[in-house]
């Protein structure tokens, strides 16, 4: 029987048991993150994928990170974790990957060494309830509704899990991203990088790829100066996925070339 999934350059992702299939959001986020300096670190470090689903983001990180990096994926859905575990086992980096069925709250409470150099998430973003009785549809709704994981809960756990010099990456719809940024700031997470994504030229913004880091008070001695000092403004860029003729743009190809089979 033919496998249901998506073939990347160095690995295959099966996703038939997952509520959320392989999609552009995660591919963009994983590609964007793996261009960062943390990926090439030579020291032992740990990464975490919150809401791992099929394990795609965790495996994308494994492809580009050093042998000293271990990546864990967590998800509340049993079927998704089963799928992620199989995808990880079939990847070339199985020895550096693991998947656990857990909510981020329980994972944080039970984690023996809760400091990750990099945390990544493609989190839920719908607020309003959607009623459905079909099992797979229910799971898809849960994966995309904040009733299962509110943004406030996500951020509160990220600040407990993230190493002092670590970076948190996520992708959100453009119309909810500013509220998310404003939630992160009082928790000590400052936006350091933002990529605004457009589907085609002359369209409204579609997605925001965001990177956060803890405010760094190390160079400021007194509390008053620290409170009055603003962090460096974030680096901002834009990306357009398609040309007007609905072909992948050169910019999008350049971003995802290490993963897409035909780029």
Curated annotation (Swiss-Prot):
Q: A single GO molecular function, which one?
A: nucleic acid binding
Which InterPro entries does the record match to this protein? Answer: DNA_methylase_N6_adenine_CS, SAM-dependent_MTases_sf, Small_mtfrase_dom, tRNA_Adenine-N(6)_MTase, tRNA_adenine-N6_MeTrfase
Q: Which family does it belong to?
A: Belongs to the methyltransferase superfamily. tRNA (adenine-N(6)-)-methyltransferase family.
What are its E.C. numbers? 2.1.1.223
The record's subcellular locations are: Cytoplasm
Record key words, sorted: Cytoplasm, Methyltransferase, S-adenosyl-L-methionine, Transferase, tRNA processing
Organism domain of life: Bacteria
Q: What does this protein do?
A: Specifically methylates the adenine in position 37 of tRNA(1)(Val) (anticodon cmo5UAC).
Identify this protein by name: tRNA1(Val) (adenine(37)-N6)-methyltransferase
What are the BP-aspect GO terms?
A: methylation; tRNA processing
